[in-house]
Structures are given as structure tokens and as C-alpha cells.
UniProtKB/Swiss-Prot annotation:
Compartments (UniProt record): Vacuole
Organism in which the protein naturally occurs: Podospora anserina (strain S / ATCC MYA-4624 / DSM 980 / FGSC 10383)
Protein name in the entry: Carboxypeptidase Y homolog A
EC number(s) recorded for this UniProt protein: 3.4.16.5
Disulfide feature: C191-C431, C325-C339, C349-C372, C356-C365, C394-C401
Residue stretch(es) of the prosequence: 18-137
Active site: S278, D470, H529
Family indicated by similarity: Belongs to the peptidase S10 family.
Keywords on record: Carboxypeptidase, Disulfide bond, Glycoprotein, Hydrolase, Protease, Signal, Vacuole, Zymogen
Gene transcribed to yield this protein: CPYA
């Protein structure tokens, strides 16, 4: 079952309106977050463990308030959505290859011990790595022409759980022996990071004739970059099972990085940064927390960057109405009556999100996601305006408004491309809507992962940047949650001066920046959801300055 109007954010997903077919739009501490929640389908069992036949049986014993919430959801969601058999379609066929240049076994890495400064022995790399292996293929740059630099591709395998994550690494064009390493993540959830590679910030793009076009403003100009297809069953990644929450995905990413840097210690000594957009506003705080939770690690994490992310729904959802109604710097998309309707819906939405924050329960978080997205994203989406860029209409609803996504998919489905990269699945999809839906019904969408950020700020800098023409994860909401975040530096951050962002030698600014302590917020002008696509030169400028530590706490 594909939910009929889910929103996928190339980085964020939800169900904005179930009544009609529209454009697809893509805890207090880490220990609490790790506890997670059972997927909704797994909760449809009775006391004896027998599957519940339908949602009516699940209501037995619930409070009247909870039942009332779900009565509303039933009006929006087809009964089939709650049928566990519909939750996971058959995965694409995969064929294991054996012509790898390197295979790194997690069990071997886990056996390595070293002596600490005080003389005690400890494992060289913490974490449960025994079930993981990393396969590495040296990519011949001449075969694809994407870039001339050294490249590696391959899979992280979790053999115990039949999970295989695909990655593609590009060395820096400049000084790879000293330049930092960046992990790039798209969101969805369920969208491939190879869309970020070819649509936004990688060494090349793909034109309508499926030809490779060089990108002079690639993020690997001054950094080595890893593009990772995660969670499983996204892009070239595959599994016989599925991942439906952010916490589970974090364990896989930690294992991948640990084994990759073990195989390539020359990169492990460099500074490492995690960057991403949209639903990566969920992923990155969790992934960074997972890495930082391991004292003995070979991942030299120095900062995180989140672009147009969804991180604090309670704060961010308050700013859909202003953005849609002319308060975000662009003309109003909705009329006065629609804006009033959004005003009327907001208190209920905020109450539901607060319920989710307080309880962490699937039964609270799923209604919050569906109601709020229907009430606050749905009206905008039904206008046909691009949810990723308020400046224009959605021109290609079959490709998340961007025809280039279709060209990228066609290119990556060519057999010679898949062979050159060592791909094991039969084909490529830019976004997997099964994963999109499963994360929604896991209750993952409204989880308060922003609560992880204060502890991250104690150790490393955090950059939140936002293109000012995006609707779905708009700059107003991102600015608001950075100012609302409870952390020791809140007062100083909120009163920090706002400065112009300019290219060297330029008279006109391309954005604004505010920084205090380890926290930085940027507004980037004339850019939608995908800032590097809309403003390639400017995004490379702030990336290089960020990696150089310009706004880090001194």
C-alpha cells in the first residue's frame, strides 16, 4: 500500500492529505531515545500475542481521549494501512558479487585492543561490530566520468539481519591528505543520497540526455565526501527486512564509519563532519549522539550541519501558516480564509505534538503527524505550488517536482553504471515510499530529537542552515527552533548579532548568519529546500568557511 499523498522531502516525509492524490513530498536524552517504540503494526496484538483483526479491537481499553484521536485518523487513513501484511513489499532482487578489492570484518576489528594512557587495556573501537562487514571496490574514474579523483564504492553488510547499505566515496579534489571528510545524507525518509550527489553538491550532475556534467562547485572541491544510501532498501541499498525508525538506522551508520576508517586510516586522522538536509534533521542528531556515545572510536567527529531540516516539530509547525500567508519574505500562496483555517488548526496540532513529546508513544505520535500534516501542509500542497520552493509550481509531480530526479534514476539504472559501482540490486529508485510510510506509522516523524542537540553542543559545533524559499522545512521554523532550544548558551545565542554572508569581494550579501558558542544559524537567500542546487557557489562558500572553523566557538 502506498499512502496516497504522502509528503517526501528529499529529506522529509509525512501524510499531508489522504483524501486525494497530490504531489509526493519527500526524549530527554540519548539513552531514552534508544529505547525506541514498537512499530504500530507490532502493537496490534492482544494480551495473548494474537494479532488484532482491526483497529476497532485495538481501541479496547483505551481512554476516550485517545479513541477520539484515532476516530479522526480513521477518516484520513484507509483501514488497509493498519494491516501488517501491507507494510513491506517484496524487496528488489539482489545478486551477491565476489570481486571486491577489500573486505573488512567487524569481528576482526572488535578483537583489536590497545593500551590507554593510564596503562589500562581497552578495545580500539567500541560498539557491537561483530555482525558487520564492509566491502570495498576501487571505482575506475574513467568508466563513469563523474570525477577524476580516487573513488570507492561498496556495501556495509549486517549479515545477522540481512542488511546491506550502499556507499560511494569521492576523495577531495584539493588536498586529500589533509582535507576533512564529510558524510552527506538525504532524507525522505527513504530517499537516496545519490540524489544529493547528482542534483545538488556532488562532482557532477546528469542532464536530460543522461550525460554527465561537471560541477565546478562540488563539495569535494576541498573535502572528501561519502554519499550513503540509508536506511536499507533506499537507492542501491537492500535487505529482506526493513528499518522504520531513526535510532535503528544510527547503529548501521556508526558501524559503516568505524569499518571504513579502519580500512582507510589515512582518512580517519582527518576532521570528520556529518551534513544533510530535511529528514536528516532527525537523522543527524541521533547519528552524532551514537558516535559521541562511544569513548573509544576512530571517527574524528568535529561538527554537524543540517540544511532545511525537520528537527523540532512543535516549534516548526507553528511557522507553516506565516510562510504560506506572506510572512516569510515571499508573496502569500493561500487566501485569508485558508490562513484562518490554519490558525484554527494550530492549537490542536500543537497539543497533539506535545502529547507525543511527553509520552513517546506511537499512539500519540502517529495522530500528531497525520493531523498536523493534513491541516498545515495539505492546504499549501493542494494549490499545486512546489512545497520545496515557494517561488513556483510543482512542475513534475512524478519526480517530486524536479524532472532531473527522473534523469538521475534513469542514469543510475543503466547496467554499465551499476557494474562499475559493484551494485548488487536489480535497479535504483530515488525514493522508497514503503520506508516513508513505515517511519510515519512508527511515530518517528514527531519524535523530539532536538533534545539531543544540547549534549551535542557540549562537544562539537552545530550549523543549522535554511534556504529562505523552502516551504516544507522553512527558514522561519528552523530559525525559531534554534532560538527556542534550551541549552546553557541560549541567552547569548538569541542576543548574538546577525551578520551578512558574502562571497569574497562581493558587495551584495547572499544570506545572514548568527553564531554564539557552538551554535550557528544561517538564512540563505533565493534558495529552496535544496540549497546547494539553487545556490551552488554560495553553499560551497559557507561549507568551506564552516569546515575551516570560521564560526566555531573560540
Amino acid at each position: 500500500m502506498r499512502v496516497a499523498a504522502s509528503t517526501v522531502l528529499l529529506g522529509v516525509a509525512s501524510a499531508a492529505s489522504f483524501q486525494q492524490q497530490t504531489q509526493h513530498v519527500l526524549s530527554s536524552g540519548y539513552e531514552r531515545a534508544q529505547a525506541g517504540m514498537k512499530p504500530l503494526a507490532e502493537q496490534f496484538v492482544d494480551a495473548a500475542g494474537k494479532p488484532i483483526a482491526n483497529i476497532e479491537e485495538a481501541f479496547h481499553g483505551m481512554t476516550a481521549e485517545v479513541k477520539a484521536l484515532w476516530d479522526e485518523i480513521k477518516l484520513l487513513v484507509p483501514e488497509s494501512a493498519f494491516n501488517h501484511s501491507n507494510w513491506f513489499t517484496k524487496p528488489k532482487p539482489a545478486r551477491r558479487r565476489h570481486d571486491w578489492d577489500h573486505v573488512v570484518k567487524g569481528a576482526d576489528v572488535q578483537k583489536l585492543w590497545v593500551q590507554g594512557e593510564s596503562g589500562e587495556d581497552h578495545r580500539q573501537v567500541d560498539g557491537k561490530l561483530a555482525d558487520f562487514n564492509l566491502r570495498v571496490k576501487a571505482v575506475d574514474p574513467s568508466k563513469l566520468g563523474v570525477d577524476k579523483v580516487k573513488q570507492y564504492s561498496g556495501y556495509l553488510d549486517d549479515e545477522a539481519n540481512d542488511k546491506h547499505l550502499f556507499y560511494w566515496f569521492f576523495e577531495s579534489r584539493n588536498d586529500p591528505k589533509n582535507d576533512p571528510v564529510v558524510l552527506w545524507l538525504n532524507g525522505g525518509p527513504g530517499c537516496s543520497s545519490l540524489t544529493g550527489l547528482f542534483l545538488e553538491l556532488g562532482p557532477s550532475s546528469i542532464d536530460k540526455k543522461l550525460k554527465v556534467v561537471n560541477n565546478e562547485f562540488s563539495w569535494n572541491n576541498n573535502a572528501s565526501v561519502i554519499f550513503l544510501d540509508q536506511p536499507v532498501n533506499v537507492g542501491y541499498s537492500y535487505s529482506g527486512n526493513s528499518v522504520s525508525n531513526t535510532i535503528a538506522a544510527g547503529k548501521d551508520v556508526y558501524a559503516l564509519l568505524s569499518l571504513f576508517f579502519h580500512q582507510f586510516p589515512e582518512y580517519a586522522k582527518q576532521d570528520f563532519h556529518i551534513a544533510g538536509e530535511s529528514y536528516a534533521g532527525h537523522y543527524i542528531p541521533v547519528f552524532a549522539s551514537e558516535i559521541l556515545s562511544h569513548k573509544n572510536r576512530n571517527i574524528n567527529l568535529k561538527s554537524i550541519l543540517i540544511g532545511n531540516g525537520l528537527t523540532d516539530g512543535l516549534t516548526q509547525y507553528e511557522h507553516y501558516r506565516p510562510m504560506a500567508c506572506g510572512k516569510g519574505g515571499y508573496p502569500a500562496v493561500l487566501d485569508e480564509s485558508e490562513c484562518r483555517s490554519m490558525d484554527n488548526a494550530l492549537p490542536r496540532c500543537q497539543s497533539l505534538i506535545q502529547n507525543c513529546y511527553d509520552s513517546g508513544s506511537v499512539w500519540s505520535c502517529v495522530p500528531a503527524s497525520i493531523y498536523c500534516n493534513n491541516a498545515l501542509i495539505g492546504p499549501y500542497q493542494r494549490t499545486g505550488q512546489n512545497v520545496y520552493d515557494i517561488r513556483g509550481k510543482c512542475e513534475d509531480s512524478s519526480n517530486l517536482c524536479y524532472s532531473a530526479l527522473g534523469w538521475i534514476s534513469d542514469y543510475l539504472n543503466q547496467q554499465d553504471v551499476m557494474d562499475a559501482l559493484g551494485v548488487e540490486v536489480s535497479g535504483y529508485e530515488s525514493c522508497n515510499f514503503d520506508i516513508n510510510r513505515n517511519f510515519l506509522f512508527q511515530g518517528d516523524w514527531m519524535q523530539p530529537f532536538h533534545r539531543l542537540v544540547p549534549n551535542i553542543l557540549k562537544e562539537i559545533p552545530v550549523l543549522i542552515y535554511a534556504g529562505d524559499a523552502d516551504y516544507i522545512c522553512n527558514w522561519l521554523g528552523n530559525q525559531a527552533w534554534t532560538e527556542a532550544l534550551e541549552w546553557p548558551g541560549k541567552k547569548n545565542f538569541n542576543k548574538a548579532s546577525i551578520k551578512d554572508l558574502k562571497l569574497a569581494g562581493a558587495e551584495k550579501e547572499y544570506g545572514k548568519v548568527k553564531a554564539s558558542g557552538n551554535f550557528t544559524f544561517m538564512q540563505v537567500y533565493q534558495a529552496g529546500h535544496m540549497v546547494p542546487m539553487d545556490q551552488p557557489e554560495n553553499s560551497l562558500d559557507f561549507l568551506n568557511r564552516w569546515l575551516g572553523g570560521e564560526w566555531f566557538a573560540k
